[in-house]
Curated annotation (Swiss-Prot):
The keyword Magnesium does not apply. Its cofactor is a divalent metal cation. The keyword Nucleus does not apply. Homodimer. Disulfide bonds: none annotated. One of its GO terms (molecular function) is metal ion binding. It is an enzyme of class 3 (hydrolase). It comes from Photobacterium profundum (strain SS9). This is 5'-deoxynucleotidase PBPRA2627.
Amino acid sequence: MEKSHFFAHLARMNLIQRWPLMRSVSTENISEHSLQVAFVAHALALIKNKKFDGNTNPERIALLGMFHDTSEVLTGDMPTPIKYYNPAIAEEYKKIELAAEQKLLSMLPEEFQEDYAPLLDSHCINKDDYVIVKQADSLCAYLKCLEELNAGNHEFAQAKKRLEKTLQTRSTPEMEYFLNTFVESFNLTLDEIS
């Protein structure tokens, strides 16, 4: 039987810190972030289906959220301002991410690669589903900014402004519903939400 290092690599998601150039009150790793993205992506899919006549598979989208940053166990987390500093850097980094996705996929026993490709390989991921995951990813980054700002960390003020613009460009009815229904609670204390 062939040995695989796939899950040993995924177990290292908790070692990859997000926001590496920012001073954080509360650190966040890609394992924690991916779970929150899965929660939010699942909610967005449900909202789309129940409120806006969507036809998505919320469980599938939650899985995509869980796996959306797995390539970072090989690449690390590249800060967004650097990653998108100019189109050439963004294009080259996308190639690095694709190579990392392929490397991870190749670590699986061959009989499972077809099953994991739609979760790991950008070329195989359903584009409509991925839009929801990207929305959730942006929402979770925005929520992190709120958390840090509410803890008195003004380091995240510019990131919050940038993410507000991103949320506007990615706006959909389901995202607006999520923002209006759930986000205000992130500005409250534990006593206030209990």
